[in-house]
Amino acid sequence: RLFGPVYAKDSEKKAIPYYNKQTNSPEPILTAKEVAEKVVADLEEARILLANDPVKTEGTLMSGSQDGTSNFMRYRALRLNYYAVEALLARVNLYMGNKTEAFEYATDVIKTADQGIFPFVDKSLVIGSPADPDRIFSSEVLFALTNTSRSKIHKNFYDPSRLPNYVFRMDDNLMSN
């Protein structure tokens, strides 16, 4: 969406290359429609591959294994899972103007709240404890991306103890004419 035309206005304009394999060679720049179709195809394949995702039967499994087995299939809310793929399919289909398909995928994801898989956040958790409020509505997180170097990145770019020239900040000159 950021690097191409407004899809609803001209989906046939060139947008970005699409890589479905690791390569050192540049791929051709595709139209927004071609990119969207490839995204949908990849997500549909992911949906099929995740058909037996434990999130569907056991929920998010947000704790470590108690029997010493691998945690690879646990913490499903923090990994790309079946419902996260469906949410992305809803989003892409809505972007493409396929409202019926978008509605079907979104409805399937919303139904998980009734099943206790991704329940809507409890108001008391948001405002109940000033010391530890749930400001990200963690029960509603469908998947997350993690950068293990986040604290280092923050220190390098945003730590106020660094010299002003080495901290990302808004330049006052940009705020005036």
Where are these regions (language model features)?
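Structured, solvent-exposed acidic/aromatic patches
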Residues: 1-177
